[in-house]
Amino acid sequence: MADGDSGSERGGSSGGPGGFSQHMSREQETQELATKRLDIQNKRFYLDVKQNAKGRFIKIAEVGAGGSKSRLTLSMGVAAEFRDYLGDFIEHYAQLGPSSPEQIAQASGEDGAGGPGGPRRALKSEFLVRENRKYYLDLKENQRGRFLRIRQTINRGPGFSGGAGGGAGLQSGQTIALPAQGLIEFRDALAKLIDDYGGEDDEGVGLGGAGGGGGGGMYGELPEGTSITVDSKRFFFDVGSNKYGVFLRVSEVKPSYRNSITVPLKAWGKFGGAFCRYSEEMKEIQERQRDKMYERRGPGDRERSLGPGGGGDDSETEDVDDD
């Protein structure tokens, strides 16, 4: 176990006897399974795997030099997507060359304060939307260097018991800033926790958001997500569950945008059949097009395509007859 500055709910103000009892209730209901501490530059990061009645989730806490904390909460499914996104950011960061002083000054803004809010230009951006939570990932640069800013916003709509002031449509947010030099170490630590504790994945598990921990409870296991890369696009296939049942989320990701669709389990067979049918039809179309192109070629073109002497087998036969 790490020290008392872990990413758990310790250290927060109780806000009176009622708040203290609620805090103790949360501590009793939520179990901490594992924690990992990372020291990157002058910051400490804690990755805590927790479990409550709805399942497992990961809390990420950033502790600054002055002791200030920022926390993010990820379901195991979202954590797996973060792991994949971190790989993309690591690859993009590795391809970036050194910045000129003019570029750094432009990226840092006029004040040059060097804080997370200073940069105006993102080198690479991605975002995720899951139930009532949104996650924004921006690779930025200021006078202190390059870093990945991760911001989480929560829509505390009707029925969300997230504390005082949780009116309809109210959003609260937390932000952490991860130095780019620590991206690989952070990704590897997150991946290890997912590998060790991510077997009970659920789309909204443990987060207390709308639709979390519903109809997917009957499934003790769901297929693992995967991704494929085609040209400049990347497609993610993630299986999740909510109160409506099991679904497949297919996400199309390009450097400039991300789009996704959700397919319920009962439609998977129809989707798969449609893909297979179109794949076979396109193969037949391509074969017919190749045949037509071959027929359009004249005899001279076909002979040239066979190489010098026309057919190699006939040439060898003639040599044998001469002997």
UniProtKB/Swiss-Prot annotation:
Which portions of the chain have biased composition (kind: Acidic residues)? 313-323
Q: Where in the cell is it found?
A: Nucleus
GO cellular component annotations, sorted alphabetically? nucleus
Q: Name one GO molecular function term.
A: RNA polymerase II transcription regulatory region sequence-specific DNA binding
List the residue ranges of the region (DNA-binding). Answer: 27-257
Indicate yes or no for the key word Ubl conjugation: no
Keywords from the UniProt entry: Acetylation, Activator, DNA-binding, Nucleus, Repressor, Transcription, Transcription regulation
Q: Which organism is it from?
A: Xenopus laevis (African clawed frog)
Name used for this protein in its record: Transcriptional regulator protein Pur-beta-A
Q: The organism's lineage?
A: Eukaryota, Metazoa, Chordata, Craniata, Vertebrata
Q: Which domain of life is it from?
A: Eukaryota
Q: Does the keyword GTP-binding apply?
A: no
Sequence ranges of Gly residues compositional bias: 9-19
Q: Which PANTHER family match?
A: PUR-TRANSCRIPTIONAL ACTIVATOR, TRANSCRIPTIONAL ACTIVATOR PROTEIN PUR-BETA
Q: What does this protein do?
A: Transcriptional regulator which can act as an activator or a repressor.
Comp. bias regions, Basic and acidic residues = 24-34, 286-305
Give the transmembrane ranges: none
- Which of the residues bear the PTM N-acetylalanine? A2
The gene that this protein is the product of is purb-a
